[in-house]
Amino acid sequence: MRREPVGVVGSIAPWNYPLQMAAWKILPAVAAGNTIVLKPAELTPLTSLLFAQAATDAGIPDGVINIVTGTGKEAGEHLVGHPDVAMTSFTGSTAVGKRVAEIATATVKRIHLELGGKAPFVVFDDADLDAAVNGAVAGALINTGQDCTAATRAYVQRPLYEAFVQKTAALMETVRLGDPFAAGTDLGPLISHVQRDRVAAFVDRARAYARVVTGGEAPEGELAKGAYYRPTLVADAAQDSEIVQSELFGPVLVVLPFDSDDEGIALANDTPYGLAASAWSRDVYRANRATREIKAGCVWVNDHIPIISEMPHGGYKASGFGKDMSSYSFEEYTQIKHVMFDNTGVARKDWHRTIFGDR
């Protein structure tokens, strides 16, 4: 058995972690012996260009790492559909991922998709409440919520529900918005005003069927001109509501109660996504059951969102397929060849009787 490079890899990276995502795609592809053409998001192209320049300065030969900037419609679709590209690796929304798969299928190329998420945060009634509250706020607000593994749906067993809502809202209200380069800032702006307005629209529509406990607005004053949005907690939404089912990509956490363990796990699985999840319990057997039954590519216990480079990252269901990081990512960028040598020197093999009989 031999693993060989696939050839030319065409990759498309998102804007939310421009350096990290570029590295996740470039490094395993090149380490496996491929060349790569990377298209960064049009909102964040400079990081990838600087990365490629640093690679050249370090001695990587010209033509191994290539950066192509442009829009998804023009540069991205052309890259995915090009017949000389042997594999496509895409990180981004599920909607765009479906389009990538459609284009790639026309040339029957390999596809690696890391798509959207709607990570559940399941708190059982024996959990450490303070730890869960801190984990929920940090997990929901990481990168201003612009993270496909961010905690977005907190399911809290009913005995802890109201206390969790109150404590989480209180902690969110202590988070300081401001310039990301300022020492006292906890939370910066979203990527753009378009994204801020999209998040705000989700929350505004939710007011008709749910309770906005805290946040739900852009700040006033000196931050009003930026793409800022206050940390937001939404409670009492229905499971089938838009804000529970759709990926927002902003600093918004929705909290819902559940009664039995069966119900909590069922609710956690009840979206199209399956990228990441967390379960909170002092009972290792209870938590381990959750890790088995929650359909997600990563399930943390008593923590949310630690990403470890030695462990694989990738999803189930509409969150895509294939793995980033770890040795599994290396395998994504190779193809398996079966090689067989016959050194017996025998001209007519035993199996040749299927043609020649006993002659």
Indicate where each model-derived feature is located.
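Structural detector of well-ordered beta-strand residues that form the stable sheet scaffold
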Residues: 30, 37, 66, 112, ...
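Short glycine-enriched loop/turn motifs at secondary-structure junctions
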Residues: 62, 115-116, 147-149, 183-185, ...
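A generic structural signal for well-ordered alpha-helical segments
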Residues: 29, 104, 168, 206-207, ...
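Rossmann-like NAD(P) dinucleotide-binding subdomain of oxidoreductase/dehydrogenase enzymes
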Residues: 1-131, 258
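Conserved residues at the C-terminal ends of beta-strands
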Residues: 12, 68-71, 91, 139, ...
